[in-house]
């Protein structure tokens, strides 16, 4: 059984027992329960439910594990004939959520 949920302007495929990494959910602390009610798609035992735009009565329940930063992404801008370059780095915040159950 899996579902596709919408959160923070993006859609994610989730399954029970798996960990979902999303944009930082600043309203929740580690250990809090989070409920996704914007379920776009559910597949259970070969049965497919597609929402218009969301599946009625479906929700996904998870538990916030942590807030952390992802690995650093480095960018380099090289200026030819100037013998110089600019290096920049960025680390994006994310929230790790363990999916506990998918309810219909």
Swiss-Prot record:
The keyword Ribonucleoprotein applies. GO terms for biological process: translation. The keyword RNA-binding applies. It comes from the Bacteria. Pfam families: Ribosomal_L21p. Keywords: Ribonucleoprotein, Ribosomal protein, RNA-binding, rRNA-binding. One of its GO terms (molecular function) is rRNA binding. One of its GO terms (cellular component) is cytoplasm. This protein binds to 23S rRNA in the presence of protein L20. Belongs to the bacterial ribosomal protein bL21 family. Part of the 50S ribosomal subunit. Contacts protein L20. This is Large ribosomal subunit protein bL21. The gene is rplU.
């Amino acid at each position: 059984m899996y579902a596709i949920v919408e959160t923070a302007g993006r859609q994610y495929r989730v399954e029970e027992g798996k960990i979902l990494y999303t944009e930082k959910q600043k309203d929740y602390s580690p250990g809090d329960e989070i409920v996704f009610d914007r379920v776009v798609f559910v597949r259970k035992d070969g049965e497919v439910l597609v929402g218009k735009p969301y599946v009625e009565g479906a929700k996904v329940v998870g538990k916030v594990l942590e807030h952390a930063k992802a690995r650093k992404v480095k960018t380099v801008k090289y200026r030819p004939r100037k013998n110089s370059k600019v290096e920049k780095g960025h680390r994006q915040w994310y929230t790790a959520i363990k999916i506990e159950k998918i309810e219909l």
